[in-house]
A protein has these predicted regions:
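Adenylate-forming
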Residues: 9, 408-409, 422-423, 443-472, ...
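Structural core segment of the AMP-binding/adenylate-forming
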Residues: 7-92
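Conserved pre-ATP/AMP-binding loop-to-beta segment of ANL
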Residues: 87-88, 95-117, 124, 150-156
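Conserved AMP-binding/adenylation subdomain of ANL enzymes
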Residues: 136-159, 163-273, 277-298, 307
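Conserved AMP-binding A3 loop
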Residues: 113-139
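Conserved C-terminal "lid"/linker of ANL adenylate-forming enzymes
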Residues: 479-483, 520-530, 556-615
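Conserved ATP-dependent adenylate/AMP-binding module captured primarily in the ANL superfamily
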Residues: 19-52, 138-157, 188-201, 303, ...
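Conserved ATP-binding/catalytic segment of the ANL
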Residues: 377-379, 385-456
């Protein structure tokens, strides 16, 4: 259906069936759609009974297509739902095509191809207009490999992501353009599909790769006796070999600018010693890993179908432990980075230049600039990241990532002001992500978000402010900051109200209440009288399960009962309780009394890690 609409020269607007009905209705109206395609009869029925499909001036659809009509004809569906617009099933539509001569339509690279509405934003979704030229750039220049590991005719890509998502959609276009086939899977059938269809390429979000990792390592951990010892030796030897190879190929992970600078400034003797050590480790570990591969890793690969030559991750940051594990197993895993507005890839790793922990380098005709958050000073620049055309300069400092290239959208549909804000004076699109161009490897590393938006491991976006506004209405909560970037779920740092806790089933004693209130600042602009006491008291609170559970239950209730109706992925799964408030004086709030999210996240990094446990 997607290809047919584009072939006809029309523009399609895609959205998942799980989207709220009011959102679907808004998108239909805002996009000026003239027809609609519904996956199921039930979806169409719910829309007709609910908000309906109505144009801005009350226009009805010219055509409704139902892909899975539950045995009904189009006429029967129209009669049952009481709608006076043409309704066709997919089979009926195909039959119409048999007797209709196709008229060729001239399409240019600047013509609108698809309209994608961003999710998880405050207010109404924004419609991203992507042209044929935007998508063609990705088809031509996005590569898995500089050599022979690209999909070829006869090979298979296993698809498990929503097909309307720009990442999955471009992956499918990429495979089809190379003559490869597609297998559509689901969470329920994924494990069977791996062994049944034995794909060559798997494209997914980090959450799925983490599920694979958990399943595989869980089985390995269940090994007994000699087998358990063999697994332990093989894992340690494999990781040692991976580290040695990374050192020798200059693929070391640099997690901070300071680490990269220190690496570059190493004395010659230290460099030589590091190289010698890596060569010795490589020589010792290689035969052990060769045997271990036959005993352990080959069986892991066979359990994943036995033919996987490339894993492609995108949608959010890939955890380093996943990078490490799949490299140990002997599977190539690469990462793409971008947004809906950039079609989506503006940086990617290729197998021959696969820097772990990074998102790689820009494809052809793409420029990346890293600017200082406050001054706008250029801290790093990348162009034509792969191959002979590489052009990179960097200070190694962290800033906001901007992108310019043929894959970047022209703008938002009916959103002139949003479009103006999204681009700088040089035509670079602001991603809202923080990162640095690593001076050692020349790769782009993501370090966080300049905007408040939280991107979960499954690729879903969460805007924290609307949720936080709901939570501070509770008498238990004075302040709250949501966290969860590149995690499975949302968690919350909750500055609790001592008085609120005391009023709720005596969660704290009158003596504690009096002591804690005396240690609190009178206002956000004044210093905290006794931060040490509050820190100790916070530890006490977090050590009381009944208190933590009471606050978490309150948080979940408020989100569940919120009139705006939050999505499943916007639910808070964990909380950490804090007594010392975020203030200007302790550096955790701006002069306009906004929480400095990056500063708070840094100060409470241990508490955040403890909420999530080991990744």
């Amino acid at each position: 259906m997607d290809g047919a609409i584009l072939k006809a020269g029309a523009t399609n607007v895609v959205r998942g069936v799980s989207a709220p009905l009011p959102e679907l209705a808004y998108i239909y109206t805002h996009s000026d759609a003239v027809a609609c395609v519904c996956e199921t009869f039930d979806l169409l029925s719910n829309m007709i009974k609910g908000p309906g499909f109505v144009g801005e001036n009350g226009e009805k659809p010219k055509l409704v297509v139902v892909m899975y009509p539950q045995g009904k004809s189009g006429a029967e569906i129209a009669a049952e739902l009481g709608i006076d617009v043409p309704v066709k099933t997919m089979d009926e539509l195909l039959a119409m095509g048999d007797s209709t001569k196709f008229r060729e339509v001239a399409v240019t690279e600047d013509d609108a191809c698809t309209l994608l509405y961003t999710s998880g934003t405050t207010g109404k979704p924004k419609g991203v207009v992507l042209s044929h030229g935007n998508l063609m750039q990705g088809l031509i220049y996005n590569e898995f490999s500089d050599q022979a590991l690209e999909p070829i005719p006869g090979e298979t890509l296993l698809s498990i992501l929503p097909c309307w998502h720009v990442f999955e959609r471009m992956a499918e276009y990429h495979a089809l353009s190379r003559g490869a086939g597609l297998v559509y899977s689901s969470v329920k059938t994924f494990k069977k599909d791996l062994t049944r269809h034995r794909p060559h390429v798997l494209v997914a979000v980090p959450r799925l790769f983490e599920s694979l990792y958990d399943g595989i390592t869980g089985k390995l951990a269940d090994s007994k006796g000699v087998k358990k010892l063999i697994v332990l030796i093989v894992r340690r030897a494999s990781m040692a070999l991976v580290d040695a190879r990374r050192t020798l190929s200059n693929r070391r992970i640099m997690t901070t600018p300071e680490e990269g600078e220190a690496y570059l400034r190493r004395p010659a003797a230290v460099k030589a010693l590091s190289t010698l050590k890596a060569r010795v480790v490589q020589a010792l570990a290689t035969p052990i890993v060769a045997v271990g591969d036959k005993l352990v890793w080959s069986k892991v690969r066979e359990g994943l179908g036995g033919r996987l030559k490339c894993l492609v991750s995108g949608g959010s940051q890939l955890a380093v432990n996943l990078d490490n594990f799949f490299e140990m197993v002997g599977l190539n895993i690469i990462v793409g980075y971008g947004l809906t507005e950039t079609s989506p890839v503006i940086c990617n790793r290729v197998i021959e230049d696969n820097i772990p922990g990074s998102v790689g380098k820009p494809p052809r005709d793409t420029e990346i600039v890293v600017r200082d958050v406050e001054s706008g000073e250029v801290l790093g620049r990348m162009r034509h990241g792969h191959g002979k055309d590489t052009d990179m300069t960097t200070t190694g400092k962290i800033g906001v990532i901007y992108a310019r290239g043929p894959q970047v959208m022209a703008g938002y549909y009916k959103g002139e002001e949003d479009t103006r804000k999204a681009f700088d004076s040089d035509g670079f699109f602001c991603t809202g992500d923080l990162g640095m161009v690593d001076p050692v490897t020349g790769a782009l590393f993501l370090t966080g978000r300049a905007k408040d938006t939280i991107v979960l491991m499954n690729g879903e976006n969460v805007e924290p402010q609307p949720i936080e506004e709901v939570l501070v209405a509770s008498d238990l909560v004075d302040q709250v900051m949501l966290v969860g970037q590149d995690r499975k779920s949302i968690a919350a740092l909750v500055v609790v109200s001592p008085a609120g806790l005391a009023a709720r089933d005596a969660l704290v004693s009158p003596v504690e209440l009096a002591a804690w209130k005396a240690a609190l600042p009178a206002s956000p602009k004044e210093p905290t009288p006794d931060p040490e006491l509050l820190a100790a008291a916070s530890a006490t609170l977090n050590g009381r399960p009944e208190v933590v559970e009471a606050v978490l239950a309150e948080v979940k209730r408020l989100i569940r009962e919120a009139p705006c109706g939050f999505q499943a992925w916007e639910q808070v799964a964990r909380v950490h309780l804090i007594l010392e408030p975020f203030t200007m004086e302790n550096g955790l709030m701006t002069q306009t009394l906004k929480i400095k999210r990056d500063v708070v996240a840094t100060q409470y990094v241990r508490e955040i890690e403890a909420m999530y446990g080991s990744r």
